[in-house]
Amino acid sequence: MTCETAPHYLILNENDLQESGDFKMNPPLRSKEDQEALIKGIQDGTIDMIATDHAPHSEEEKAKGQKKSAMGIVGLEKAFPLLYTGLVKTDIISLEKLIELLNDNPRRRFGLKQEDSWCLWDLNDHYVIDEKDFLSKGKASPFKGMEVYGRCLKTVCEGRTVYEYKGE
């Protein structure tokens, strides 16, 4: 049996909600107590995976406020920096635990190979999340303007470079 949660439920709670459609997701953000229970779940192993729940939508689909915007946010590109900043740098979990939750456990669960596939990160690179830097077609993110650590410098998939950071 496995259990997963998404980065936004570990980093945000209902106190962070704004009227913007960027904050509309399903399930919605819950209480601080619920957020703390999820964090306890990743610490004690009840939750063994973190999945991004990446749901890109057009600007038009997300510009209708909380009530009428499409459900979902982008999550793939900034999951690691958000979780590294919010959970590892604050000593809630170790870097090894984060890698286990994001990579190792999902890979084992779904029988995925990792041959010649890796990412190179600069864990000291500190920056502000800006939607103009997103490669995803969707830009809806409740994390815009947040300061994070950790920039992906290179991604290699099955021996082929699929991403390389070119600088600002």
Predicted regions and their residues:
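Histidine/acidic residue-rich metal-binding segments in metalloenzymes
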Residues: 1-50
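Short, glycine/acidic-enriched loop or turn micro-motifs at the edges of active sites
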Residues: 7, 56, 125
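Short acidic, glycine/serine/threonine-rich loops at helix termini
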Residues: 12-17, 61-64, 131-133
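His/Asp/Glu-enriched, well-ordered alpha-helical/loop segment
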Residues: 22-23, 43-44, 49-50, 55-121
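C-terminal cap of metal-dependent C-N hydrolases
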Residues: 65-68, 116-167
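Glycine/Thr-rich phosphate-binding loops of Rossmann-like dinucleotide-binding domains
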Residues: 11, 58-60, 128-129, 165
